[in-house]
Every structure is written in structure tokens, then in C-alpha cells.
């Protein structure tokens, strides 16, 4: 029984299957953690969702910003962009089933036995574990409810960007969603900066990566995140693991075997990397919420 953690898949099914074959993944015995952004940019978003769903309880995943964007597109709230390559998913006969499964997935995973926390973008320095759990549950509750289109319509926006327990309603949900799925940089007080998408060494002062600020999360817990492909998994402190290594941009799909902290990688298949890089958008470009 092994625990495997994999970074953002972005519709790259062939690379995912090749990577799982490297470690002889057995869904009957092993557990697979996924950092979110299962869909968009790669060629096989539909088949990725079908495959991950078929794994049932063997999977512990979180939603990423591209997954939320897919939900918004399917609900008629956001526009389907050709570069996301999700039209086959939207037109699939089982699209309703897949979308309803996807919107019931969590935005946060916490395992108290393994001392593991996973969120697509990370954990804001303004939250401790209990606050993160509470805010994640609130987002998950509205996503799984019949009123989820109202939330999806309101989630786009960068404000508020400063946590307060006094936040309520859609403003509170938007902050939580941004913190869990879009965050990269923070100001020294922990306030989110939703504009800069550069590498840490090129970010303007006083911005710092969220993981370089003092955190309220119990240091016994390790934090797993994806989302930030340009990091290439490097430059993070001990106990923080960035697993998005840009497979859909021609980089790697990365797996971390938690039992012995050993990394495995699968290089992107060249043809797909060329398609994305020739479409005129930068590696790691994010969906704008």
C-alpha cells in the first residue's frame, strides 16, 4: 500500500498512465493524490476525467482553477476558449455525469495520520489548519448544491484579497477560492497578490511566494500543491512540495511516492508540447478568475 502524489495533469492522459506504470500503481491497494487542474490545455481532458473517476476511492484529489473554470463554462457562465481544448468534454454523452461528479470533489485534503495537507495553490499564511478546513467546507458545500451556478458566476474577481473572519457570503467564498486555487504571491502581512505570475526571483518587492512567509499551519504537517509550473518544484522550504512541473508546456508530469519521498517523472510527449507552445500563450498561464 503506497501513497502517490501527482501534480497538475491538464488533460495529459498518456503521460499520466505512463507515469503510473513506472510505479506499478494498483488502485486496489494504493492511494493516488492529485493536485487539481485535471483538465484544459492537454489533448485528453475528457478521458482524464473518465479515468480518474473510474479509480473511485483510490483517489484523493482537489479542484484547481482550471477545473472550476470548466464548471463555469459548462454552466454557461464563462466562454469556452479553443486553447483549453475541452470541447470534446463539453459535447460528451456523459458530460453531465462527469461535471456533477467533478463539482462534488473537495478543494482541500487533510490526512492527520500522514500529516499531509493538499490544496491546488497552497495554504494562505493567514490560515491555520482549522480555518482552512472550515473555509474549504464552505466552498465545497456551495459547489455541491443546486445553487452552484450562482457561486461560479460570483467567483471571478481578485477582491477581497485579505482574510478576515468577518468576511461573509460571496466575498468570503471568493477569497477562499482564490486562496486555495489561484494564490502564488503574498504581501508581507499575508494579503494575497492576484496579479503577479512571475518566478519568485523576478517578482517585485515586497511580494513573496506564499510559502516563504511565516505560516500558521502546524509545522508537523507537510503541504502539497500544484498550480505554479514555472517553479518546476524548486525553491520551496522543507515540508512544502510543489508538484506542477508543466507537463502540458513540454515539461514533466511529476509523481512523489510519499512512503520514501522518491520522485518519478514522465516527460511530455513532444507533439502536445508543440501544440500548446505554438498557440501563443506562456507556460503556466492561469485562468483569470
UniProtKB/Swiss-Prot annotation:
InterPro entries: ApaH, Calcineurin-like_PHP_ApaH, Metallo-depent_PP-like. Pfam families: Metallophos. It is an enzyme of class 3 (hydrolase). GO terms for cellular component: cytoplasm. The keyword DNA damage does not apply. Keywords: Hydrolase. It comes from the Bacteria. Its EC number is 3.6.1.41. It catalyses: P(1),P(4)-bis(5'-adenosyl) tetraphosphate + H2O = 2 ADP + 2 H(+). GO terms for molecular function: bis(5'-nucleosyl)-tetraphosphatase (symmetrical) activity; phosphatase activity. CDD domains: MPP_ApaH. GO terms for biological process: RNA decapping. Hydrolyzes diadenosine 5',5'''-P1,P4-tetraphosphate to yield ADP. Belongs to the Ap4A hydrolase family. This is Bis(5'-nucleosyl)-tetraphosphatase, symmetrical.
Amino acid at each position: 500500500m503506497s501513497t502517490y502524489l501527482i501534480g497538475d495533469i491538464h488533460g495529459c492522459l498518456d503521460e499520466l498512465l505512463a507515469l503510473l506504470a513506472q510505479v506499478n500503481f494498483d488502485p486496489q491497494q494504493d492511494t493516488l493524490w492529485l493536485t487539481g487542474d485535471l483538465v484544459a490545455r492537454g489533448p485528453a481532458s475528457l478521458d482524464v476525467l473518465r479515468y480518474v473517476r473510474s479509480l473511485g476511492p483510490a483517489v484523493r484529489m482537489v479542484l484547481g482553477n482550471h477545473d472550476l473554470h470548466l464548471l463555469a463554462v459548462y454552466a454557461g457562465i464563462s466562454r469556452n476558449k479553443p486553447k483549453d481544448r475541452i470541447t470534446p468534454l463539453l459535447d460528451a454523452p456523459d458530460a453531465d455525469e462527469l461535471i456533477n461528479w467533478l463539482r462534488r470533489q473537495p478543494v482541500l485534503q487533510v490526512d492527520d495520520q500522514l500529516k499531509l495537507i493538499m490544496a491546488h495553490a497552497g495554504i494562505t499564511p493567514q490560515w491555520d489548519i482549522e480555518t482552512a478546513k472550515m473555509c474549504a467546507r464552505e466552498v465545497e458545500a456551495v459547489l455541491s448544491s443546486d445553487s452552484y451556478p450562482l457561486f461560479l458566476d460570483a467567483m471571478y474577481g481578485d477582491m477581497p484579497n485579505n482574510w478576515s473572519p468577518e468576511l461573509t457570503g460571496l466575498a468570503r467564498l471568493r477569497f477562499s477560492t482564490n486562496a486555495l486555487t489561484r494564490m502564488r504571491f503574498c504581501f508581507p502581512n499575508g494579503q494575497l497578490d492576484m496579479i503577479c505570475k512571475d518566478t519568485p526571483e523576478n517578482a517585485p518587492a515586497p511580494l513573496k511566494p506564499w510559502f516563504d512567509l511565516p505560516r500558521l499551519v502546524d509545522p508537523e504537517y507537510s503541504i502539497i500543491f500544484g498550480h505554479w509550473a514555472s517553479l518546476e518544484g524548486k525553491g520551496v522550504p522543507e515540508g512544502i512540495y510543489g508538484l506542477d512541473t508543466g507537463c502540458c508546456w513540454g515539461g514533466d508530469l511529476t509523481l512523489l511516492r510519499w512512503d520514501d519521498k522518491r520522485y518519478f517523472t514522465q516527460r511530455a510527449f513532444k507533439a502536445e508540447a508543440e501544440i500548446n507552445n505554438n498557440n501563443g500563450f506562456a507556460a503556466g498561464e492561469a485562468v483569470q478568475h
